[in-house]
Amino acid sequence: MAAMKRLLASSLLILLSGCSLMQPPIESAETIQGTTTVDAVEGDKSESNSGLTDALRNRTDPVAGDPAWAPIHPKGKPEHYAAETGSLFNLASSSSMYDDSKPRGVGDIITVTLNESTKAAKSADADLNKKNDASMDPLAVGGKDLTIGDYNFSYALKNDNKFSGSAAANQSNSMSGSITVEVIEVLANGNLVIRGEKWLTLNTGDEYIRLSGTIRPDDIDFDNTIASNRISNARIQYSGTGTNQDMQEPGFLARFFNVSL
């Protein structure tokens, strides 16, 4: 009997010690994203600095798969089971007849129509003209000119300065196309923070478009598109990498002489 009591006591101690070692469940976020950097249009330029090549080009190319631009993956919400009532109506899957399918949550997708066009012109003209004349008649004493040798006391000065200059500058830019981005954050006022990129691989290099900004759900059209001029704090980057991009830029010697001269 005593041995049985000792066995029960030891079993109880082992059970209590095992319960104390159990860790509480770890709460995971509803959204898994590759980065916490929200506003980073440039992102990480390259995986590793290529040294002399980047120094001579004075440019570091971005790379595809940048963690700052990684897509986010919302986790599935747990299902809530309700007692069966025999009704065919399911409140969880119901929607209002006045509601639409606009993106309103993290991970939703929206297409941005790029239609950017800017034009600036400036001209300036300047004309300056300054003219001075000064003279003095010969001094006369007793009706005769006062002289020293062959020179009298008189002078005549004239000064004429002119300056003329003109300058003109014209610049225009345009961009058209589309890019599909994701909602990465929902602000307290209901506005949506969007971010996304598109990479096109060519024979001798890559081209990419990156876009981020803040939009209003009311500005989204019925076909789930929004114009780029409706984006607040928009950052749009369109460029390329590789040989074609290198050929469009002057070399480091040309840049050096352009600056020094």
From Swiss-Prot:
Q: Extract the signal peptide range.
A: 1-18
- Chain residue ranges for the region called Disordered: 37-67
Main location as per UniProt: membrane
In the UniProt record, does the keyword Chaperone occur?
A: no
- Say which domain of life the source belongs to: Bacteria
Q: Which InterPro entries does the entry link to?
A: Flag_Lring (IPR000527)
- Alphabetically, which GO biological process terms does the record hold? bacterial-type flagellum-dependent cell motility
Q: Listed GO molecular functions?
A: cytoskeletal motor activity
* Lipid linkage positions (S-diacylglycerol cysteine): C19
Its cellular-component GO annotations read: bacterial-type flagellum basal body, distal rod, L ring; cell outer membrane
List the PROSITE patterns hit by this protein, alphabetically.
PROKAR_LIPOPROTEIN
- Keywords, alphabetical: Bacterial flagellum, Cell outer membrane, Lipoprotein, Membrane, Palmitate, Signal
**According to the Swiss-Prot or TrEMBL entry, at which residues is a lipid covalently attached (N-palmitoyl cysteine)?**
C19
> Do the record's keywords include Chaperone?
no
Where found? Cell outer membrane; Bacterial flagellum basal body
- What is the protein's membrane topology class? Lipid-anchor
Q: Describe its assembly.
A: The basal body constitutes a major portion of the flagellar organelle and consists of four rings (L,P,S, and M) mounted on a central rod.
Please report which protein family the annotation says this sequence is part of: Belongs to the FlgH family.
Could you tell me what this protein does? Assembles around the rod to form the L-ring and probably protects the motor/basal body from shearing forces during rotation.
NCBIfam families from the UniProt entry: PRK00249.1-2
Name the chain's protein. Answer: Flagellar L-ring protein
Source species of the chain? Vibrio cholerae serotype O1 (strain ATCC 39541 / Classical Ogawa 395 / O395)
